[in-house]
Regions:
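Zinc-dependent deaminase catalytic domain
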Residues: 1-149
Length: 149
């Protein structure tokens, strides 16, 4: 990894620290970059106008004993990757040919959105047990790299 990869991953980690997820280990950040310029950022948290999990002082998934990686729709949070893509859509910013830096490997739902957004490269730091997401990235021809310092 080069100095820019390190800088952008540090930025993704900073953005992830803004997460409103009740579970500290689920603070995820994502930034989308093109030509060394940040286009958008995203962190996982409740949609605008919805009470956050931190404010609720609970994780509904933990409360209902939902295993990690299952029933992803049963959560207040919008994923960091989704928020970065949504922000681009709201601002009219094209992500074609851009690189996404993400603190965690995306889930399959985010993988499909990343592919369709036009992002061409993903650099992630921490793994996530979702082999199908990686299979989709491979089939779509998206370059995926695990960040190593």
């Amino acid at each position: 990894m080069n100095k820019w990869d390190k800088r952008f991953m540090q930025m993704a980690e900073l953005v992830g620290s803004w997460s409103s997820c009740f579970q500290q280990n689920r603070h995820v950040g994502a930034i989308v970059v093109k030509d060394k310029r940040i286009l958008t950022t995203g962190y996982n948290g409740a949609p605008s106008g919805i009470i956050t999990c931190v404010e609720r002082a609970e994780c509904i998934r933990r409360k209902e004993n939902i295993p990690s990686g299952t029933r992803q729709e049963y959560c207040y949070a919008v994923h960091a990757e989704q928020n970065a893509i949504i922000q681009a859509a709201r601002l009219g910013v094209s992500l074609n040919g851009a690189t996404m830096y993400c603190t965690h490997q995306p889930c399959v739902i985010c993988a499909r959105m990343i592919i369709n957004s036009g992002i061409s490269k993903l650099i992630y730091k921490d793994g996530y047990p979702d082999e199908f997401a990686m299979r989709l990235f491979n089939e779509a021809g998206l370059t995926v790299e695990k960040y190593e310092e």
